[in-house]
Structure formats: C-alpha cells, structure tokens
From Swiss-Prot:
Matches recorded under NCBIfam families: L27
Name assigned to this protein: Large ribosomal subunit protein bL27
Alphabetized UniProt keyword annotations: Ribonucleoprotein, Ribosomal protein
UniProt-recorded Gene Ontology molecular function terms: structural constituent of ribosome
Family to which this protein belongs: Belongs to the bacterial ribosomal protein bL27 family.
Domain of life: Bacteria
HAMAP family hit by this protein: Ribosomal_bL27 (MF_00539)
Phylogenetic classification of the source organism: Bacteria, Pseudomonadati, Pseudomonadota, Betaproteobacteria, Burkholderiales
GO biological process: translation
Native species: Polynucleobacter asymbioticus (strain DSM 18221 / CIP 109841 / QLW-P1DMWA-1)
Compositional bias of kind Gly residues: 1-10
Disordered as annotated region, ranges: 1-22
Length: 86
C-alpha cells in the first residue's frame, strides 16, 4: 500500500503579468520631449498644456520642461501639464 496519498493536481498556479502602470515622472521634475509621464487605463489623469495622449491613454511630454500636476474644470478632473523652462 502507498505510504503517502497521491499528489493530485491543482487548479491554481496562474497569474497575469503586471502592466507597470502609474506615474513615471512626478510634479516638479524635469522631463524631455517624448518621455512618458503616466501610464494608465482610461483617462484617470487628463492631458494639459504640452502633454500628448497615446491610444492606450499614456500621457507623454510634447516639449522639454517641468512637470506640473493640477485640477481643471468644475468637476475638478486631475490634469498634468509640462511648463517650458524659463
């Protein structure tokens, strides 16, 4: 007779790869044109001045400058802008 029970199989053991979302450059930091500021799902943060938006809602800098976070409109939506160096 067997001294141990059979091992059997498990139905667990799978997980998806992390998507590395989030803020990549914070307020007050210098950024170069084309650099990613935020990777996000949907427009949690909206693009402001000198910020572009990709087809996956990634926000990126259009110019070299300093990153600034704020709110816009009556609904107080989060927004990120890039201010040119003066």
């Amino acid at each position: 007779m067997a001294q141990k029970k059979g091992g059997g199989s498990t139905r667990n053991g799978r997980d998806s790869e992390s998507k590395r979302l989030g803020v990549k450059v914070f307020g007050g930091e210098h950024i170069n044109a084309g650099s990613i500021i935020i990777r996000q799902r949907g427009t949690r943060v909206h693009p402001g001045a000198n910020v572009g938006i990709g087809k996956d809602h990634t926000l990126f800098a259009l110019i070299d400058g300093q990153v600034e976070f704020g709110v816009k409109g009556a609904l107080k939506k989060a927004q990120v802008s890039v201010l040119p160096r003066s």
